[in-house]
């Protein structure tokens, strides 16, 4: 579901509904599957489990008007990483896919495809192959990853990494030039296309 609204206009109900459906909706079945696989493993039975979650470029890159949806989908990406660390010992992989496609949920978010070729390019069919592969035995060594999939690209969305650093600073009045120096070395945020420096908000370098 979507309940798009600018943050200043968003109601608590709109926030709760989206978080509940997407983030809690990911947690709820996963915990039962995790407990089952854990018990199977402890009983000495072979386990070759897969969890494939659905994240979004709105969550991993950010999109205006979707603080609720983006937060839920970013939470799913983090959930995927942490669950992969917990469940790997039982023989379970946990990955996520951030799909970009024309669906009933997204068809009113932008201009409709003008040609059959454009509609084909935005088809959900480009999402299915990576989901199928992640569910297969071939993907056994891949876990804790978020894959972006669309008619434009198949990519691995790389998570947070530590960027430029400084020694700890006790006096906040001295932070200005230190942060400015770190910002000059930092990568610019990616926009919805996943490329560095395409984030719409101006970023100081």
Residue ranges, per PLM feature:
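Alpha-helical segment proximal to the catalytic Tyr-Lys
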Residues: 35, 85-89, 114
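The catalytic Tyr-X3-Lys active-site helix of short-chain dehydrogenase/reductase
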Residues: 59-62, 67-75
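Substrate-binding pocket helix/loop in short-chain dehydrogenase/reductase
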Residues: 6-7, 14-16
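Active-site helix of classical SDR
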Residues: 30, 72, 80
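C-terminal helical subdomain
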Residues: 96, 116-205
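Active-site-adjacent segment of SDR/Rossmann-fold oxidoreductases
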Residues: 41, 61, 77, 82-92, ...
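Residue(s) in the substrate-gating loop at a strand-loop-helix junction
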Residues: 56
């Amino acid at each position: 579901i979507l309940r798009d609204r600018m943050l200043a206009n968003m109601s608590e109900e709109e926030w709760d509904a989206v978080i509940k459906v997407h983030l809690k909706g990911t947690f709820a079945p996963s915990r039962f599957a995790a407990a089952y696989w854990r018990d199977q493993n402890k009983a000495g039975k072979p386990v070759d489990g897969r969890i494939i979650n659905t994240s979004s470029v709105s969550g991993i890159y950010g999109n205006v008007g979707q603080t609720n949806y983006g937060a839920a989908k970013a939470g799913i990406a983090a959930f995927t990483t942490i669950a992969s660390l917990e469940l790997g010992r039982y023989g379970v992989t946990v990955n996520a896919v951030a799909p970009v496609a024309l669906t009933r949920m997204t068809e009113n978010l932008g201009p409709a495809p003008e040609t059959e070729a454009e509609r084909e390019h935005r088809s959900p069919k480009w999402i299915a192959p990576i989901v199928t592969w992640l569910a297969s035995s071939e993907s056994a060594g891949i876990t804790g990853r978020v894959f972006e999939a669309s008619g434009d690209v198949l990519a691995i969305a790389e998570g947070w990494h530590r960027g430029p650093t400084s020694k700890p600073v006790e006096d906040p009045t001295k932070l200005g030039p230190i942060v400015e120096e770190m910002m000059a070395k930092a990568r610019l945020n990616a926009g919805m296309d996943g490329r560095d420096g395409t984030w719409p908000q101006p970023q100081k370098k």
